[in-house]
Amino acid sequence: MAKYYITPTLLNSWQYNINNGTLEDFVKVLNKEQFEPTESIQKGFEYEAYMQKNYKETLGGAYQVKVSKEYGDYLLYGIIDCLKGGIIYDYKYTKNYEVGKFYNNHQTLMYLEMVPEARKMVYLITNKFEKIEYADNNFKDIKSVAYDIGDIFREEYTKDLFPETIKTVIHKFEEWLKMYGLYETYTEKWKCKY
């Protein structure tokens, strides 16, 4: 029976720490400290809601799908933005986009492992998303909303594109936590409830 959660956010935060040396920020994630969402995070939520209601390719899909899979002592867990026709979709807002930005996102390997019947994972990305509110001239105290959206970039990945498996990533994560004396904190804070 699985003992500890592993989420894409946790692994991505760890990866960011390794690449950018922000151990303090990773420890906050590891300790599940609350934080105030940044403007970019808030725009990401709004972009996701907009896409669920308006993007033709994903209309009628299953949204906010909770997925999990036991993996030894670990329970891989995530929430898929949209699952439709054997494809996992994830909506991403980022201020600065470069081609291949999400290639190293652990979300891809995790989701394709947890949903083995999915053929691929598709990221639908924009670097411009502005919500514009204006007064509706026909009604007092009612505002109308419009959106100014930039290009929607697309990244598609299949499991066979990656040199590492999720098993390898989890092993490296576990060893790194032990090496930095953080494994005990992890097992305390990320213990499965059930």
Cite the ranges covered by each PLM segment.
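Metal-dependent nuclease catalytic cores that hydrolyze phosphodiester bonds in DNA/RNA
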Residues: 1-87, 185-194
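Mg2+/Mn2+-dependent nuclease catalytic core
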Residues: 65-172, 176
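Charged phosphate-binding loop/patch that engages nucleotide di/tri-phosphates or the phosphate backbone
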Residues: 169, 174-194
